[in-house]
A protein has these predicted regions:
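EAL-family c-di-GMP phosphodiesterase catalytic domain
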Residues: 2-12, 18, 40-45, 126-133, ...
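Bacterial c-di-GMP phosphodiesterase EAL domain
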Residues: 1-117
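Short, conserved glycine- and acidic-residue-centered signature motifs
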Residues: 67, 136, 140, 193
Length: 261
C-alpha cells in the first residue's frame, strides 16, 4: 500500500477532462454541457495499468480514501484550468466518479462543506456498485435527497451492462444515465441494440432523466443517438481526454492573443 499512499502524498496523478456535449446541433455546433474529470495515476513499476492501480486500491479497502482525494484534487485542478472560460460563459458542469459507499462517510461530508467548485456545478457519477446492497432503499433515498438539497446532481454510469447497473438506477433515481460504450459501439450495425436503445431513451425521457451516450467515435453513432433523442454525447468523436494543465496553457494563450488582437 505504500505505493498508493505515496501517489496521494505526492499528488502523482494526471488530471484530464473530456467534453460532454449537446447531441442536437445549433448552427452545426455541439454546444458544451460539461466535462468528465479523470484522474490517472502516474504509474511506476508496481502497476501495468490504471485499472490495476484502482483494483489494487479497492482490494485493500482504499476506495473511499482515493475517492475523496481524487475528487478534491480533480476539482481543484479543473477550477484552476477554467477560470477564463468561467468568466465568459458560466461554470460548466463537472462530472466526477464516486462510490456509493463514499457518500455515507464522514470524509465526504467534510469535503462537501468545502468543495473547490460550487456544488451546483458538480455531477456525481456512481461508477461502480460497491456497497449498494449494504444500504436500504430508504437510506439511499435519504442520501439522494441530501445531495439534491446541497445542489448536486447524480449520474449512474455504465447503464445497460447487466443487473447491477439497472439495480442502481432503480434505487438512485438519477438526473443522468450514461449509456455504456459497449452498447454504443457500432450500434448502426445492430438492429436489436437500436430497438432496445430507442425504447430505453424514450422511457428515460418520460422520467425526466437526461441521457449521455458514452464512447462515441463515429459519425454514424452520433447520427443514431441524435435521431432517437439522446440528450448528450461523449467520446473521441467530440474530444479526446485533455490534461487540464494543457487546457490551462491553451486558455491563457487565447486570453493573451485576444488582448493583442
Amino acid at each position: 500500500m505504500q505505493c498508493v499512499n505515496s501517489a496521494m502524498e505526492q499528488q502523482q496523478f494526471q488530471t484530464l477532462r473530456q467534453s460532454i456535449v449537446d447531441l442536437p446541433q445549433r448552427d452545426n455546433v455541439h454546444a458544451l454541457h460539461g466535462f468528465e474529470i479523470l484522474n490517472r495515476p502516474l504509474l511506476g513499476t508496481e502497476f501495468s495499468s490504471v485499472e490495476e492501480f484502482y483494483s489494487f486500491s479497492a482490494s485493500h479497502g482504499r476506495s473511499r480514501v482515493l475517492d475523496i482525494f481524487t475528487i478534491n484534487l480533480g476539482l481543484q485542478r479543473f477550477r484552476d484550468s477554467t477560470l477564463s472560460e468561467s468568466s465568459q460563459s458560466g461554470q460548466p458542469l463537472v462530472f466526477v466518479n464516486i462510490h456509493l459507499s463514499t457518500l455515507f462517510s464522514d470524509e465526504w461530508q467534510d469535503l462537501l462543506v468545502d468543495l473547490p467548485v460550487p456544488p451546483t456545478s458538480v455531477v456525481l457519477e456512481l461508477s461502480e456498485r460497491e456497497g449498494l446492497n449494504t444500504y436500504s432503499n430508504r437510506d439511499v433515498d435519504f442520501m439522494m435527497r441530501d445531495l439534491q438539497r446541497a445542489g448536486l446532481k447524480v449520474a449512474v454510469d455504465d447503464v445497460g451492462m447487466g443487473y447491477s447497473g439497472l439495480h442502481t438506477l432503480a434505487m438512485v433515481h438519477p438526473d443522468y444515465v450514461k449509456i455504456d460504450r459497449q452498447l454504443v459501439f457500432n450500434i448502426d450495425h445492430d438492429p436489436y441494440r437500436q430497438h432496445m436503445m430507442k425504447s430505453l431513451v424514450e422511457y428515460w425521457k418520460r422520467e425526466d432523466v437526461s441521457t449521455i451516450a458514452e464512447g462515441i467515435e463515429r459519425e454514424q453513432e452520433v447520427a443514431f443517438f441524435t435521431e432517437i433523442g439522446t440528450t448528450f454525447g461523449q467520446g473521441y468523436w467530440f474530444q479526446q481526454p485533455e490534461p487540464v494543465a494543457v487546457a490551462t496553457q491553451r486558455i491563457e494563450a487565447q486570453a493573451r492573443d485576444s488582448l493583442h488582437a
